[in-house]
Amino acid sequence: MNRLVVIIATLFVPTTYSATGDSWCYHDPSCDDTTWSTIASEHCNGSRQSPINIVSASAVGDETLTAFTFTKYGDNSTMNKIKNTGKTVKVELTSGVQVTGGALSEVYDSLQFHLHWGNGTSVPGSEHTVDGTRYPMELHIVNAKSSHNGNTTTAVTDSTGLAALGFFIEAMPGNATGSPPAWNTLTSYLANITLKDEYINITHAISLDELLEGVDRTKYYRYLGSLTTPNCNEAVVWTVFKDPIKVSQDLIDLFSTTLHIDHNSTSALMTNVFRNIQPGNDWVVTTQGRPASGASTMCSSLGLMALAWMLLRV
């Protein structure tokens, strides 16, 4: 691959939509996520903060959570640039990539995707957890309502202005390396963006569908939450897919062993780039299926039986 590295000053589709710039971080106690409620207090102290631990048994059935329609996710020329932001790896998407359905209120434009990870096999780094389990990585596709015309400044002021598609990533079993091919191609660009603000044009044919191979995109969890980085705007319809993407461990390890958080190679490697689980605020997490009316009826019946037993003992 030709090394065409450019350092840019202008922003394309921001990952964080943050007004606080470099004032927040993951790696330093003076600016890590324990301080964000002070750094960006307007939203990071909110009542619908993300990420969350999803308790699968508590997810409420919702028959409106139908299948999505993905536009241009199969197009292998929609990935424009890949960039080291100093906090993640972000891939900018070309116009026309969209998602609708899945009980979303309108068509959403897919703007970019980025990733969260820990530190190789020693620290898993997904943001969301399911029943307390944290996956090695998590991919987020960030989408904005088409009615905002790509204006993320207005989108973050709309309680459902953004839709985030979250995909867990786990290691393939066995000793596979360099797999799947699409991920092998994507991660081959990391060597060209080792330092903060470096980016390179993506010239290989890669589609979103190829990166999401093996995921049943009809099975997911849904809740209303926030951006997981400052300013933590509570403007996100979260969809977290149940099936993980399977990637060979050697490719997962590249993220925590190749990228640096600053503009020089002596700066720290980019590890543990995820926000910790946020305190419970009575989120309603839904999933496909009918509401568990039978379960509530059973609970009511058991309650009446208990009351009757107590009255008999009086």
Residues covered by each model-derived region:
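Alpha-carbonic anhydrase
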Residues: 2-314
